């Protein structure tokens, strides 16, 4: 059910097997704690499309007016944008698409269980609680179809 990956490239194997969830645990950069503790108390949400070719520019534009300049001036902000850009490029390659739908926010949108009606979802949690996949024996996967 779960594929534990060693690196981002190993995530590419996910769609060639029957796992339902792939997990890649990464080490948090030392200078990220202060940045994310400040970002987490700033309510924001932004969404749009991010192209593989212009991922850094697209993400920068999406966050430009949504994240306060004080946070944007933090030296870690550029590292964070670059990381999101690399993940988006990888997911475009994974999906074999030129662009992907992108959402970024400081508050969880889903408070309860739901079914995703998308073939694949790339969820990245930088700070705080992530997400949980219910095992098949705990969920009726056909109930919402």
At which residue positions do the language-model features occur?
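Sequence-level motif detector for i,i+2 pairs with an aromatic at +2
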Residues: 18-21, 97, 120
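A structural signal for short, well-ordered beta-strand segments and their strand-loop junctions
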Residues: 22-25, 99-104, 124
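Catalytic core of non-heme Fe(II) oxygenases with the double-stranded beta-helix
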Residues: 107-145
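N-terminal auxiliary "cap/dimerization" subdomain that precedes the catalytic jelly-roll/cupin core
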Residues: 1-68, 75-82, 86, 90
